[in-house]
Amino acid sequence: MDRAIDIDFRTISVVGLGYIGLPTATVLASRQREVIGVDINQHAVDTINQGRIHIVEPDLDMLVRAAVSQGYLRATTEPEPADAFLIAVPTPFLDNKQPDLSYIEAAARAIAPVLKRGDLVVLESTSPVGATEQLSDWLSAQRPDLSFPHQQGEESDIRVAHCPERVLPGHVLRELVENDRIIGGMTPKCSEAAQRLYELFVRGRCIVTDARTAEMCKLTENAFRDVNIAFANELSMICDEIGVNVWELISVANRHPRVNILQPGPGVGGHCIAVDPWFIVDAAPESARLIRTAREVNDAKPHYVLDRVKQAARRFKEPVIACFGLSFKANIDDLRESPAIEIVQTMVQQQLGTVLVVEPHIKVLPAALQGVELLNAEAALSRADIVVLLVDHQQFRKLDTDRLQSRVVIDTRGMWSAKRIAA
């Protein structure tokens, strides 16, 4: 019988136990498979083995506690033999906007010694086109006794595929199960093996393609969103110049049946939309002109917000600035590539005034924000001359906007402004 069809995936290893890896490992464990989570962060490993979590994601704590107590999930810092390996490590970009694949290479070096004939390796990390082939090459360099798809094609000992995550923070557990998945194997048998694995827990469609198309698919999805956000952000700056309320404008423009303008903000953050388009630009710099421009527009938006804060600060002798929200999107604790972090950090560096932060989803400010106070909303409002809304957390919607009347308000998300329009 074909090895791909015969594979049973009794033991599955997930390398990288962050915002994607840990929920994926937990969902697999809930299907009563033995799951070995691997992470270089000893604190994360210890926390998980105690049945607790080191990240914020709704309902994840209960599932991890159950999976660990039932013996289906455990974490370690060193890879162990398994039937399938899912790599979910970061893929940031370097200072020159080129992709940094060092985490993927490190994962390949870590799992290579425990690979055996018939194993499946899946790259889940969002990656530039060609990264899955590079992963196969790195693995083969460590294990010349095994054959890999870029060498032996369908007859390889090890199957290698790419299956990018496509989940929304705050809804990860539901979307891991319900969303369609794009599965791109380096060969048809690689795709078949990966499809078998994901069908253990995915209720959505598993759509099979090749590895390069799967890689480009995820980049395309995020570049599409980035371009549309850039349109909204640019529109907000134009409206400020010509004296039009952008929130009201978007609301009425979206009444057109074929118009759906997104909401502007202080920039674009997170580990996907703020990063992935650069992978396309790096691969085809002369052709990716619109994608590059969208990235530049969104990267420039924090500076635009800062200019507005500077103008407001000139009205006060010793301004106190309260910044509401630090995460890259609403209702999560993830600060990766957050424009709010950049804005607050620059306020401190440029000494615009006393800077306060309200971020209900974290207990300690990042080291980059030394000199900033973390307060609750009431304490911050009682001291603030200027209030800057950077993230539209649900908690901030409950704020009595009458409390803002005597303060300068810079609402980058339209949350309080929209309430006033509706009223």
Swiss-Prot record:
Q: Which InterPro entries match?
A: 6-PGluconate_DH-like_C_sf, NAD(P)-bd_dom_sf, UDP-Glc/GDP-Man, UDP-Glc/GDP-Man_DH_C, UDP-Glc/GDP-Man_DH_C_sf, UDP-Glc/GDP-Man_DH_dimer, UDP-Glc/GDP-Man_DH_N, UDP_ManNAc/GlcNAc_DH
Q: Which domain of life is it from?
A: Bacteria
So what EC number does this one have? Answer: 1.1.1.-
Question: Sorted alphabetically, which SMART domains does this protein's record hold?
Answer: UDPG_MGDP_dh_C
Keywords from UniProt, A to Z, are:
Lipopolysaccharide biosynthesis, NAD, Oxidoreductase, Plasmid
Q: Where does NAD(+) bind?
A: 11-28
Alphabetically, which GO biological process terms does the record hold? Answer: lipopolysaccharide biosynthetic process
This protein's name: NDP-N-acetyl-D-galactosaminuronic acid dehydrogenase
Q: Which organism is it from?
A: Ralstonia nicotianae (strain ATCC BAA-1114 / GMI1000) (Ralstonia solanacearum)
Q: Which gene encodes it?
A: epsD
